[in-house]
Structure formats: C-alpha cells, structure tokens
Regions:
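Short, flexible/disordered intra-domain loops and linkers
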Residues: 40-47, 189-194, 226-230
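Active-site beta->alpha N-cap acidic-glycine motif
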Residues: 2-87, 240, 246
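Active-site-adjacent pocket scaffolds in enzyme catalytic domains
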Residues: 3-17, 123-213
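Generic enzyme active-site microenvironment
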Residues: 32-34, 92, 218, 249
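C-terminal domain-boundary segment and adjacent tail
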Residues: 56-66, 203-263
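Metal-dependent polysaccharide deacetylase catalytic core of the NodB/CE4 family, i.e.
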Residues: 59-142, 157-160, 174, 180-190, ...
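Short, glycine/charged-enriched secondary-structure capping and boundary segments
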Residues: 45-47, 81-83, 107, 143-145, ...
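Well-ordered, non-membrane alpha-helical segments in soluble/globular domains
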Residues: 47-54, 113-114, 195-204, 231-237
Length: 263
C-alpha cells in the first residue's frame, strides 16, 4: 500500500514556472522552524525565553520566518506562540499531536487535522502545513482541501535546483503549492562541531541553490539551544545571511500568496 502512495505522489505534482513573479537574478529563501518542545519525541530542554531569543535575533536583522507549530504546543504555550507572531513571523501547522502521517491510519490523520482546526487557533491565520519528519502522505490531500491549506513543505534535498510544485485542479487544490526545503539542522544532532563548522553547514546551501528559485532552510528550536556550539553557529549563520545582498527572505505564506496569484 505504501509503495502505491509513493507512485501517486510522483504523479500529483507539477513544477511551477516562477516566471515574471520572481527576478531571475535573486535567490529566494525562507527560514522555517518546527516548534515541537516536549512533543518532538525526544528529550528536550527549551523555555519561552529561548524561543524569544531566536525571534529577537531574526528581528535584529529584519528577517521574518515561518514557524510550523504542533497544536499541543499552541495549547500549552499560547504566550510563546503569540510572541513569535508579534515579531512578524508566520504560524503554520506541524500537525496537532506531532503525528507521523506515514505511520498513521486514515482515521488518525483525519482526527488530527480536525483537532488542529480548533477555534482557538483561528485568528493565527494558518495557511501552511509541514509533516513531522517530512513523512508526508498522499492521504492528507483531502484534509488540505477540507481545511483550506494554501501550501505545504517537504524537504527534498534538491540542493542546486529546488522545485516549487503545484497540485493539479482535479484535487480541489489548484491554488495550493508545495515548497522545497534543501537542508535542516537535523544532521547536527549529537555531533561535536565547532560553531564555525555549524555556520558553514548552513551557509553552503546559500551558495549552491540557483538564482530564480525558492528554497528553505529549517531548524528545530529545541535542537538549536541543546548545544552551545550549535547555537553560536546558528547565530553566525544569521549574521552571515544579513550580508548576502543576492538573497531575498520572505515567509512561506508570502511566497505562496505571490505564486497563487500567478497560477
């Protein structure tokens, strides 16, 4: 059954020609955070203060980002979520319960999407979705349509030529897009790198992905603060990013709005 889903995935998506909406001389980047806290499946030690330090760092350089947040985190730490948004960052869904879609039943998937559709979250203007562990499943398509999502995100690893996809009209998702993430911080977990190594790890993506394309770099807040060297390397990367005049940074939602207006 799973192999059937993988075949369907290959047939579902069509590459978008970014065309006149995006300057071919600039690289279009989005920064995203999977905000999971104790619901990540790992032992974590992160506070609201740690999270605020991240958003303040981004704000210092006038960067905005997209935070894909677990619904249970939204319920338990509402002040933290509001604070993230107050700095101009976008809020997206990382499922309600950090559900691994490819390991779940269809009933579990539908129940999770329904739980995330809580009235408590309505004013957060959530339009995007990112599957935990990047384990997306085609069975989520009907939920995308039913709950009004405008984009999703998947780590493709297509470092040099990230592709932005659209969903075909027959799925009631003709105005929905899929963004490509090229790298995240997961490979840094349990490593013993120096801060400059961490900075280089992230910055290599900036040099490789092509102008005229949209690409994402992802982070887990709990992982960033789990090791001082990782944190300092992340800070170094953000500082370096601020010097790159060839890179435009927007939220996923901002890119989606531009793209859906040109499909």
């Amino acid at each position: 059954m799973r192999s059937r889903y993988k075949l369907l995935e290959k047939r579902l998506f069509r590459a978008i020609d970014l065309g006149s909406a995006f300057d071919g001389n600039s690289k279009y980047l989005f920064l995203y955070f999977d905000y999971e806290r104790e619901y990540s499946g790992h032992k974590t030690d992160i506070t609201d203060t740690d999270v605020e330090e991240i958003v303040k760092l981004l704000a210092r350089y006038q960067f905005v980002s997209t935070w894909f947040i677990v619904g249970q985190v939204m319920e338990k730490y509402p002040d933290s979520v509001r604070n993230i948004q107050s700095y101009g960052n976008e809020i997206g869904s990382h499922t309600y319960s950090h559900l691994i879609l490819r390991e779940a039943t269809l009933t579990q998937i539908k129940k999770d999407f329904s739980a995330f559709d809580s009235p408590k979250f309505k004013d957060l203007n959530i339009k995007g979705f990112h599957s935990p562990r990047d384990q997306w499943d085609v069975r989520a398509l009907s939920c995308y349509a039913n709950y009004g999502y405008k984009y999703d995100l998947l780590k493709t690893g297509l470092m040099d030529s990230p592709i932005t996809f659209r969903f075909p009209p027959k799925n009631r998702l003709d105005s929905m897009v899929r963004f490509s993430s090229v790298i995240d911080d997961w490979d840094l977990f349990h490593t013993e790198l120096e801060p400059e190594d961490v900075t280089r790890y992230f910055s290599k993506a900036l040099d490789v992905f092509q102008a005229g394309t949209i690409a994402g770099i992802g982070f887990h807040p709990w992982l960033l603060v789990s090791d001082r060297n990782i944190w300092e390397g992340f800070v170094g990367f953000i500082k370096l990013l601020s010097t790159r005049k060839d890179i435009t940074i927007k939220t996923c939602g901002q890119y989606a709005e531009i793209l859906t207006g040109n499909l």
